[in-house]
């Protein structure tokens, strides 16, 4: 090792293993106790380093880097509450299978709870949402302690990288002095390579699955959030040629087929309570669903069989009907399944089965017509703004949507398939971190990264605006709608006298001033006509990040959306749209 590196042997071991296991991107936050990690990683040319002061923003920035690159990303912070600020991003990564490696510096164990500054109980603090954890001293006194550190670091890092991938936590305690350097350590560490047996389902299992699929009178495939995968889309396109099979693919599934339904809420609103639409066989994959209507429909349907394709163990029983947990990757499963169904034909289909997909397509056409009719003269609102925005997003974009309202509006519109995919932090569904995640994504993605966020979510993550990694490819649309507007739409809070003070929490967001303070270009639209005019220049290439404020009427957004669903469901014709 170069003499410019830390003399703490644990730092050298960690750097070597990071490099050997392909963890080359690191997001670091300033501090004193993590100084050996900071200056050592900074001086090592093998790593791409990002320094972000706010640990919560840093965690989500790393999440965005990992999403865009498909690689594991390291995090480095100092001791104390700095580590706790990683928790939201680490929890999000846990529920989405994203490999983040959180390395937290700590004080010596003997000083915990002894009124030492920046000293808290860090060990196991994130145990509930990491795949693996270890706590080590940065100094090794014996060959046995060096072996132990090497082994534990290998084990934890392998957990992050093995299927299903996910976050891990390495807590490393440092004694003073912290700034010493040494050339006495070789740095040639042992890497334990993880080799997993190729997962292949037995032939008898494939035969059973094919047989059950062909025998089932009504099959529904449901896709939750999933990274873009053209092979999966192609396989599902072939499978959905069977007349007894329908695909519901959420916008975040990044699945695009000719016949798949990607607007679940409006189609289900038009479907009503027709029990003949209930599936006999349900096959699901991907992450959690946005659509509460779809979850409710499937729980009510109680399908006779539900296959969950999921690498997690145990698999979630979201619809209270799970009968088969197929513990394998969705991409390989669908490609193999489509190949085995080639030249097959459904067996003994009932009249309902023969027309199952056709029945859903008929309802979809009805819902589409009602949607177009409603939107043709819909008043200015969030709903209208999303219709306009989605017409202008360039094909090369990566679309990020914040929680909770923006990601739901996306599902009401059929829109283009964007080259960079569609994303949202739906592992935990929190409003924090949306801007930081999009910023991290834009560091890797060469096209336009667009974030659509609400004003409350925007303010919640405003520290992202002053990161030093703002580039000319990032575009942010802030829906200025007066706070947590979703609470005016969902049943319950809208009837309480505490709606504004405890739920919606309206606020005046100084969007223009914030853009100016941090060097962003600023635009604004307060009508559909203004939005149509400003969007081409908003998306035009340039060397500055651009922030567009879209102001909509706070008290009209929820009535318009409620009126929309009333109209789609055919209950009545809206008086005021």
Swiss-Prot record:
One of its GO terms (biological process) is menaquinone biosynthetic process. InterPro entries: MenaQ_synth_MenD (IPR004433), THDP-binding (IPR029061), Thiamin_PyroP_enz_TPP-bd_dom (IPR012001). It catalyses: isochorismate + 2-oxoglutarate + H(+) = 5-enolpyruvoyl-6-hydroxy-2-succinyl-cyclohex-3-ene-1-carboxylate + CO2. Its cofactor is Mg(2+); Mn(2+); thiamine diphosphate. It is an enzyme of class 2 (transferase). Binds 1 thiamine pyrophosphate per subunit. One of its GO terms (molecular function) is 2-succinyl-5-enolpyruvyl-6-hydroxy-3-cyclohexene-1-carboxylic-acid synthase activity. Gene3D superfamilies: 3.40.50.970, TPP-binding domain (3.40.50.1220). Its EC number is 2.2.1.9. The keyword Hydrolase does not apply. It holds the Pfam family TPP_enzyme_N. SUPFAM superfamilies: Thiamin diphosphate-binding fold (THDP-binding). Pathway: Quinol/quinone metabolism; 1,4-dihydroxy-2-naphthoate biosynthesis; 1,4-dihydroxy-2-naphthoate from chorismate: step 2/7; Quinol/quinone metabolism; menaquinone biosynthesis. Keywords: Magnesium, Manganese, Menaquinone biosynthesis, Metal-binding, Thiamine pyrophosphate, Transferase. Catalyzes the thiamine diphosphate-dependent decarboxylation of 2-oxoglutarate and the subsequent addition of the resulting succinic semialdehyde-thiamine pyrophosphate anion to isochorismate to yield 2-succinyl-5-enolpyruvyl-6-hydroxy-3-cyclohexene-1-carboxylate (SEPHCHC). Belongs to the TPP enzyme family. MenD subfamily. HAMAP family: MenD (MF_01659). Homodimer. This is 2-succinyl-5-enolpyruvyl-6-hydroxy-3-cyclohexene-1-carboxylate synthase. The gene is menD.
